[in-house]
């Protein structure tokens, strides 16, 4: 009762907004009419005033052209769907192409060449105008996954850029409003980094529908909610985490539309007495009477289930669940939708996306709360608000994390949160005509150090989005080594004093060191093979490095007449730094100490001028030292060859032959640049040339592409990281 009173107060406060125009984007599926009895929904059953944008799912593709899935869609559903705009002139309708069952092969074929994309774009403009749609929604699940090659990530971006250009040109020529362009994208971090360039998508698309649901389901071994608003730290499976992740990658917040599911997912419990959150399950529970899909209930089926079940609230996730016997259900209701809508407004996101409008209680016959109870609350909070300076309520976002909410089982919590396997499945129970609906691929999870807590905050995190890195595995390692730097710095300074006492002994053994140079170079292959082992002892090595640089000054005072050997020593230093570069592939911490060693070389060369006057008497040792010079020369030559090879490989990895090079970003970093902690970035910026004005060769490459400028930027990083 207390929660209901609190919610009532919050809703009254939310009636006053900051004047921002929020989108309420609602999907309608072309199979909704095929459900039995009162669950059968046609377009004329929809309320045209509830949503700001209606999206018809789904169209298909044939011979690289957009087509209707069947004649009924084209002749009956399309006209009836767009006729809703006669009742609401402000309503926008879009046609979505793709979906889970559509797969990826037809997308890949269409994206592969400029000619295929142009054919698709021409068909899209004609098809949308003929049937009265206001835009296109791309529902490609997912570029670079499920059989889609990695370069589809970039070809997908090229298609979006070319669609936007064509839509603008068509609007200019016909004086019609420009067609809208949106896309449905994943809310799972590892899929995001594999499939999308978040920054560029945010610039090209009118809005982005984030699939912030299907985060838990009966494919897992433990119960979990389908779409929690928040999650525990180190857990990326929540709507807030997904939205903030896209925003951190550079997507404008006002273009991000958060997903709201009008369905729940159920589990069959292992033990009836263990019925809380994160308890063991044996798979999906019984299918719904109308949707007929195991592990899945539409909201109108949820209402029937909870009327005879025990209901609970997950405090830190702001969502409900219910259980009856061995059946456990995580779902959304009007209260959880209200909290999520308030979160959207508080974070200034673009609005809410509903999957789907036809799974709400359309006629109000199942739940007893009137037609469209879920979507109606979103309409009240996001659309029917008036401008006012009243601030949004803050207190509910600052509650502490309660890991032991009603019925939770903490014993199972750790195992679930530490899993590194993500199941990819159809969003929102899309597949309605087949018995097998779940598909999955194993993905490596991203470290969730930026997880969103009920406080609505996120810990700082940096992201490096480059064309070369399509997976998050490398980035995860880079983040770990950054932490490693800061931990070893203090230890280095503590050992300096002890090493300075051995200066005199070091100066007497200089000749012996030069003779052993050849032996050191011979052991380089062995060192590189043992890299994994070396990384475990790196902490000890890094602590002595700074001390060595400080003892050089003492050596210069006692080393009379060693000017002839100085050159030989400087050559061996280059060889050592090369060894370090190999090791830095496994432990970046070692590469940081290399800078300290290279600085000692400069110090020695500076003392050479002063000592050259006392060369007499040391010349007897010169022949022995000169014998090592050829070996040093070989090392220097090898380094130069490797640097050239690395640069060549970097260039090749950026632009695979299958990619259309309408635009790309090129980054290179040679070993010598790594030694000086410098990174060179070259950005090729495209001139404003229409894709239609580019003549394409058979492999899809444009040969009339012009570039406005070649910009070279050099960033210098301090040696302390």
Swiss-Prot record:
It comes from the Eukaryota. Residues 444-465 are annotated as: Disordered. It is found in: Cytoplasmic vesicle, Secretory vesicle. Chitin binds at residues 71-72, 98-101, 142, 211-214, 355. Disulfide bonds join 26-51. Sequence repeats lie at residues 486-492, 493-499, 500-506, 507-513, 514-520, 521-527, 528-534, 535-541, 542-548, 549-555, 556-562, 563-569, 570-576, 577-583, 584-590, 591-597, 598-604, 605-611, 612-618, 619-625, 626-632. Residues 22-385 form the GH18 domain. Glycans are attached at residues 402, 442, 469. Keywords: Cytoplasmic vesicle, Disulfide bond, Fertilization, Glycoprotein, Repeat, Signal. Residues 444-456 have a biased composition (Polar residues). Residues 1-21 form the signal peptide. GO terms for biological process: carbohydrate metabolic process; negative regulation of binding of sperm to zona pellucida; single fertilization. One of its GO terms (cellular component) is perivitelline space. Epithelial cells of the oviduct. Residues 486-632 are annotated as: 21 X 7 AA tandem repeats of S-K-[TAI]-[TI]-[TAP]-[GED]-[IVM]. Gene3D superfamilies: 3.10.50.10, Glycosidases. CDD domains: GH18_chitolectin_chitotriosidase. InterPro entries: Chitinase_II/V-like_cat (IPR011583), Chitinase_insertion_sf (IPR029070), Glyco_hydro18_cat (IPR001223), Glycoside_hydrolase_SF (IPR017853), Glycosyl_Hydrlase_18 (IPR050314). GO terms for molecular function: chitin binding. Binds to oocyte zona pellucida in vivo. May play a role in the fertilization process and/or early embryonic development. Belongs to the glycosyl hydrolase 18 family. This is Oviduct-specific glycoprotein.
